[in-house]
């Protein structure tokens, strides 16, 4: 056992975790400084890659298209494998995501080739900026986690408009290690800086990309079966948290899902008011697997 490991073994877990994160943070800051200097000297467009996981939580269409229209950028989407729900689910979600982005006209790549059982090497893509859309470690294959992005700037734009002032929502290790954290509002920026202290990232409040679509007069409403404007439209989007926090069974703060309480009621309402109201069911992507566990 090395002297460093011996010292770490004598320290509280929280202090060891902070020390390890601090070392990563320092290394990342040096990496970003080198990359910025390289880009300043390069006379070419900037290669940006969105790391996408699930088409149902993709909120970055307007951002991708703005980059695609600007000669300064070369945007690409890399569909990353979700590895915490089994191989079948991983492959299905990758197929759905890839096909959706192809239909949108994106330049899109699969990170995993099922036929050859091989993964895309991020280094081979020669990326300048990687944009993360989900902060949680263990969700995607570690090949694509921030620890293994060695020669690119990294950014984070959340997959959701956060409404909860909890540290775990704003201070995951990835959120602290990125080059720039683009958040929704000044309120969110204050929370990021509060919870990530002293290892906070460069944080900028720029709004939320999907809300750009409210300015688009040609918004897509193809998801609605009926185009009858007299029908009211209701989207029911229950959260996945039908259980308490698995790390703390006494923590009920994250049990936000009302699915078990209202599922039968919502079916009854859809039938009762089918001539007056049109419903869309849009559950959180992992609600289904949590229901199987219930």
Per-segment meaning from a language model:
Residues 48, 173-175, 247-253:
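Glycine- and acidic
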